[in-house]
Amino acid sequence: MDLHGGNIYRLQREGKDNLLDYSSNINPLGVPEKFKERVINSFHILEKYPDPEYVELRENIAKYNGVKLENIVVGNGATEILFLHMKAMKPKKTLIVAPAFAEYKRALDTIESEILYYPLLEENSWNLDVENFLKELPQCDLVVICNPNNPTGSFIPLEKIERINSELEKRGIKLFIDEAFIEFVEDWENQTAILLKSKNIFIMRALTKFFAVPGVRLGYGITFDSEVLKKMESYKEPWSVNSFAELAGKTMLWDSEYIETTEKWITEEKKWFFEESQKIENIRTYKTNVNFVLVKLLKYNSSYVREKMIEKDVVVRDASNFQYLNESYIRLAIKNRENNIKVLKALEEVMRWKHLC
């Protein structure tokens, strides 16, 4: 199975064209028009190396998040930030709240960190029971939380993050928070862990999902601990962020029209998508805070449903390789209304079939 989902390129090489890719959680509005215009008029920037310190880029990211230049580290996608942070901090024992992004484990494996997992439970609608979590928390060096969570779409409000961090600080445990999807959360500006301004917290972000530019590869980290930043920079390769990625960060963060349109779309569409999916037989869906939905299959298994959906020109995410999930789960992106209708219709037809798994 592919680690991150549908591998649309492999399917296309096999002759499957015109697929709706619902395995990838990218903003359906596509690349912002203002960024496209800037790219067309900016080919001259390729004639020079990027600023090795990325001062203007970091200033823009800092202003967007209400922090200072010295709080920002940039990288070639959030993945570079993740691997840099683990390499710099070298936690001997790490607790991951799961299910979660597979790259956490890969990054920790490179430094031979002992990995423990704490499960989000279906009976809690995948929401973290904070008091129980703190009660059962083992001694470790680092806790990793994906917030909003991928693949469940659950979200831990800021006051609960503050409660968790306060307890972790007392125990000498650092907190790593992946906020790659937070801009899809309603009122996210008042829910981000940045507001805590805690030296104990490292926050990872990316432009990939919200601004629909996975091919650009621009991620960043936010820390209020200057020593963490220095350690990460010492391991960082020069010019890992290319000139167009730098341009993206300096352009898209200020595209208020695109941001407002996206926020309006996700507020309406996630509600509609959840309500419509509830009408489909033999599945269970969970309320989401973001642009994807976790689906439990009450009939058939994930690999079977994935193949049948491909026959209907739709790629879904087989979620069975997430920690604590199994072949009863798939994940669906939320896209534009026209395509969402097609996908839910296809899923309804698949779940009605009488074939045996």
Task: Name these PLM-found stretches.
Residues 30-32, 53, 200-279, 283-286:
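PLP-dependent aminotransferase class I/II
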Residues 267, 280-312, 334:
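Conserved PLP-binding catalytic core of the aspartate aminotransferase-like
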Residues 123-183:
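Active-site phosphate-binding strand-loop segment of PLP-dependent enzymes
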Residues 1-48, 139:
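N-terminal "arm"/small-domain region of PLP-dependent enzymes with the aminotransferase-like
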Residues 159, 311-312, 323-357:
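PLP-dependent enzyme catalytic core of the Aspartate aminotransferase-like
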Residues 50, 62-84:
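Short loop-beta-helix segment that forms the pyridoxal 5′-phosphate
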Residues 87-145:
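PLP-dependent aminotransferase-like
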Residues 68-72, 172, 179, 199-200:
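Short acidic capping loops at alpha-helix termini that bridge into adjacent secondary structure
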